[in-house]
Amino acid sequence: AGSKEYVDWIDGLFTENPLKNVTKWKDKFKVKVVDYPSDMEADIRAQMVGGDKSCRILSSYTRKWESMSNLAPLHDADADFDFDLADKNGKRWQRYWNNPNGYAIYVQGAGNSMMHQDPLSEVGCPYVVRGFDFDYVGLLWLEDIYVRNGKWYVSIKHNEETATASSRKRARDEQKEAIRNKFIKGKMKDIDEVPGFDPRFPAAHALFETVAQAYRILLTRAIKGVTIYIKDEETRAYVRELLNGE
């Protein structure tokens, strides 16, 4: 990212004590939170028109890789979209995940690929962009990590990363044990939302930290600025308050 102070702010965002240092970096690095995915895309495209060609759209692992079987540089016309999100005015915002054939296709827009034709045509995952920077980044912040009454939670169900399967199972088993012992109320089949910072639930905290780290990676890929679509209204309001210094 283009500002050390901003990186420090991101490091503190997913904690119980977020930094209040926005005034130190807001003139060096642009952060904008929007209400719809199309608003995010439009903002990033405006930067491209202005001459900043190195722009990408990113997301954490909230969606399955439905298009994984399509291994050609160009997605098949009838391939299922990985991202199919409700947008303004009853419309849908749709995209594919990055092509799994190699980092160069997404990062460099190499070959006869969708990314060569349009740098915003695919959504990049944390693995594909780790270690790479872009002028501007658009982020899809969906259902996997969110705020309730000022406290962080992580969703077990809305996480499609294969590497976290064991972590998700441990967090779920931890909740089941707590329900059996009547430490908490709930139904086994409904287990999903787990607290990020409850000392009674270390497995939940470990899962939260893994997901939060993915967001730290995504939110620090931009050199000049990031535009964030946050699906959850309460989380969106929380981040906006922090950006406003409240």
Q: In which residue ranges do the predicted regions lie?
A:
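Conserved helicase/translocase motor-coupling segment
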Residues: 2-153, 205-208
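C-terminal accessory regions
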Residues: 115-246
